[in-house]
Amino acid sequence: MPELPEVETVRRGLQPFMEGATVVRVEQNRPDLRFAFPENFAERLSGRRIEALGRRAKYLTVHLDDGLSIISHLGMSGSFRIEAEDAQGLPGGFHHERSKNSLHDHVVFHLMRSDGASARIIYNDPRRFGFMLFAEKGALEEHPLLKDLGVEPTGNLLSGEVLAALFKGRRTPLKAALLDQRLIAGLGNIYVCEALWRAGLSPMRAAGSVAGEMDVMERLAGAIRSVIAQAIAAGGSSLKDYIQADGALGYFQHSFSVYGREGKPCRNPACGGTVERVVQSGRSTFFCASCQT
């Protein structure tokens, strides 16, 4: 399932083609994905101007000129394909074969861009686990999917001081705390494993046990911010079914230090340990017991 960097990569790929464009019409090829499409989905979007594309945690948000917003989630295998005259100029050249399989094209947005050029934005989802829902004018932040989300782990919003306040008194393992979307929004299994390795912290350690150590909290906050920023710059992890908006595979997976590297040498040159795998709450955790304490 795509994590925050993958969704941000998709947002940035779609942005030049969607922002400022007018929706000419929408082809809706089935009544539902994970959830049913909103009533009159295609009709309500026709003629609307797209003001901005945003992201909250792992959700893509599309803001329209009448105040209506679309909340979209890519699910396990969702992707957007761009068909436009200048689309070939984007990285990847739109050559990913799966994204061109029209059998799973469930929604097609026909757009007229501000420069007069046309574009088609196609949502493809073989597993149909993604979704598109509406948030009415003024109700986006209070939407049930968004209202309880925690702080974003990007920019300067996440600091050691913020982490200390979030972790204080918590007995849950550090990894579980970092995956709690009510505390920090958008972190997933891959990048939590990587951030904990960079910070030198055991994923099994109780979150509250380090809340009072500000140097440790600052180190962890910095590790989270840097791993997310680097993943976004690299185009996301592209594991399994995830692909970018332009159809190209990302390459951050080549930089993984622990994730998926069970039994391989730790990449900390001062360590000499071996990457281990354990299961926490049904998910694989990769870490180095030698340098993560």
Swiss-Prot record:
GO molecular function: 8-oxo-7,8-dihydroguanine DNA N-glycosylase activity; class I DNA-(apurinic or apyrimidinic site) endonuclease activity; damaged DNA binding; zinc ion binding
Positions annotated as zinc finger (FPG-type): 257-293
General function of this protein: Involved in base excision repair of DNA damaged by oxidation or by mutagenic agents. Acts as a DNA glycosylase that recognizes and removes damaged bases. Has a preference for oxidized purines, such as 7,8-dihydro-8-oxoguanine (8-oxoG). Has AP (apurinic/apyrimidinic) lyase activity and introduces nicks in the DNA strand. Cleaves the DNA backbone by beta-delta elimination to generate a single-strand break at the site of the removed base with both 3'- and 5'-phosphates.
Record EC number: 3.2.2.23, 4.2.99.18
Alphabetized UniProt keyword annotations: DNA damage, DNA repair, DNA-binding, Glycosidase, Hydrolase, Lyase, Metal-binding, Multifunctional enzyme, Zinc, Zinc-finger
InterPro entries, per the entry: DNA_glyclase/AP_lyase_DNA-bd, DNA_glyclase_Znf_dom_DNA_BS, Formamido-pyr_DNA_Glyclase, FPG_cat, MutM-like_N-ter, Ribosomal_uS13-like_H2TH, Znf_DNA_glyclase/AP_lyase, Znf_FPG/IleRS
PROSITE patterns (UniProt xref): FPG_CAT (PS51068), ZF_FPG_1 (PS01242), ZF_FPG_2 (PS51066)
Note accompanying the cofactor annotation: Binds 1 zinc ion per subunit.
Gene3D superfamilies listed in its UniProt record: 1.10.8.50, MutM-like, N-terminal
Residues where DNA binds: H104, R127, R170
HAMAP family to which the protein is assigned, alphabetical: Fapy_DNA_glycosyl
Disulphides: none
Active site as annotated: P2 (schiff-base intermediate with dna), E3 (proton donor), K58 (proton donor), R283 (proton donor)
Biological process terms in GO annotation: base-excision repair
Keyword Kinase on entry: no
Family membership: Belongs to the FPG family.
Reaction equation(s) it catalyzes: Hydrolysis of DNA containing ring-opened 7-methylguanine residues, releasing 2,6-diamino-4-hydroxy-5-(N-methyl)formamidopyrimidine; 2'-deoxyribonucleotide-(2'-deoxyribose 5'-phosphate)-2'-deoxyribonucleotide-DNA = a 3'-end 2'-deoxyribonucleotide-(2,3-dehydro-2,3-deoxyribose 5'-phosphate)-DNA + a 5'-end 5'-phospho-2'-deoxyribonucleoside-DNA + H(+)
Cofactor(s) this protein requires: Zn(2+)
Quaternary assembly: Monomer.
Name recorded for this polypeptide: Formamidopyrimidine-DNA glycosylase
